[in-house]
Structures are given as structure tokens and as C-alpha cells.
Amino acid sequence: MINFLEYSDREVLVSQVTQTLASDLSSSIEERRNVIFSVPGGSTPGPIFDKLCEFDLDWKRVSIILNDERWVPENSERSNTKLLRERLLIKNASDATYISMFCDALTPELGIPKLQQQIESKLPISVLLF
């Protein structure tokens, strides 16, 4: 069942979602040795990332993976990795590990074996933002 939450404005939404994510990450870190945090790209989660990166968590135990990356090199302006590097993988969260969803294969299909091997060892996903 989906539970829709309403917020009075964008600032309240960002604050409350960020607080919930930080709490969920903290709980996951307490329960597991390492956690995986799956996040979307694009500009929408940017304000959340701006605040979340400041939380005092054991970021060294957090691996971050995009759940909607494009098949473009990470340095491309179209890559969601750029957003993560600029807005989430900074400040306290700079200690987190980033799991890339891109490799040197010509197509996503050809890259699956390499990416699958890299990702499977980190599963399951502990906290998901979508």
C-alpha cells in the first residue's frame, strides 16, 4: 500500500525527507557492517543531497548507487554521477563509496556482467530514495 505524504512547502519536504533518510541510514549502519543507499539522479533530489551530506553518519560504511543512471561517461554533462559528486559525495558524505553504473563497455548490455559482479557483492539495498 502506498502512503502519500503532504508537506506544506518544498522546504518542509526537503527537511523531513532528509531527516528520515539520515535516520534510516543510521539504523541500517547500526544493524549491518556495510549499507547500500540507492538514489535517483536529476535535479529533484539535489536539495535533499545538499542537507544529507552534512549529517554526521559513519559514511565510510555507506555505498551509494544511482537507480537511474544514463549510459554515458561519468564526466558527461548528462551523467547523474556529476550531480552526486557535486551535491552528495561532499562534506561528511565524502567518505561514502560510490558504485558506478557505467563501465567501458560499448553498450549497457555488454556492461552487465562487469556491473553485476560489482553490485552483487554490496546487496541488498538498505535505504532507497526514488
Language model segments and positions:
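Short amphipathic alpha-helical segments
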Residues: F49-L52, E77-R78
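A glycine- and small-aliphatic-rich helix-loop capping segment at beta-alpha/alpha-beta transitions
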Residues: K51-W59
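Ligand-binding beta-strand-loop-alpha-helix segment within the catalytic cores
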Residues: K60-V127
